[in-house]
């Protein structure tokens, strides 16, 4: 009986693990590929595309590693207390380890599309949200 209950518990935990991992992610992000970084134990490289519609917000956050990428499709964005500014197509993205960034709202006119590559600590959440 104890073995059966243990098996049910393990199955329930395994089922819920993806839900917990997704709760730490951005709903606008679609992961394209994830691989271990050769020659650097404990590091991985993750490529993603994120699409934000007008009205979507990207909360302030940081990563446990470096984020690089570019703006595929630009849009106007607004940081709290700041006038709107353009994130232009082709603009580079480079955010250093543990440095908070983001915190803007997309105001349009179209969607903002970002391609990013994260080189981060394996096993840590990709995003840590910052208040």
Feature-to-residue mapping (PLM):
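Short beta-strand His + acidic residue motifs that chelate non-heme Fe in jelly-roll/DSBH
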Residues: 60, 78-79, 95, 101-108
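N-terminal targeting signals for Sec/Tat export/insertion, comprising classic cleavable signal peptides
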Residues: 33-65, 107
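Ligand-binding loop in jelly-roll beta-barrel domains
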Residues: 99-124
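Extracytoplasmic low-complexity repetitive segments enriched in small/polar residues
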Residues: 35, 54, 77, 92, ...
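Short acidic-glycine-tyrosine-enriched beta hairpin
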Residues: 37, 52-53, 81-99
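A short, N-terminal "cap"/entry segment at the start of jelly-roll beta-barrel domains
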Residues: 2-46, 93-96, 126-131
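Glycine- and acidic-residue-biased ligand/ion/polar-headgroup-sensing regions
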Residues: 64-82, 91
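Structural recognition of the beta-strand scaffold that forms the well-ordered cores
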Residues: 60, 69-70, 94-95, 113-116
């Amino acid at each position: 009986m104890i073995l059966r209950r243990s098996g049910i518990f393990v199955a329930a935990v395994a089922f819920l693990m993806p839900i917990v991992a997704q709760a730490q992610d951005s709903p606008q992000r679609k992961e394209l590929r994830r691989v271990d970084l050769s020659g650097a134990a404990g590091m991985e490289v993750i490529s993603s595309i994120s699409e934000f519609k007008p009205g979507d917000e990207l909360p302030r956050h940081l990563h446990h590693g470096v984020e690089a990428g570019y703006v595929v499709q630009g849009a106007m964005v607004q940081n709290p207390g700041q006038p709107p500014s353009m994130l232009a197509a082709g603009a580079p993205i480079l955010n250093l380890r543990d440095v908070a960034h983001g915190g803007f709202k997309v105001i349009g006119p179209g969607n903002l599309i970002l391609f990013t590559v994260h080189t981060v600590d394996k096993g840590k959440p990709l995003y840590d949200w910052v208040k």
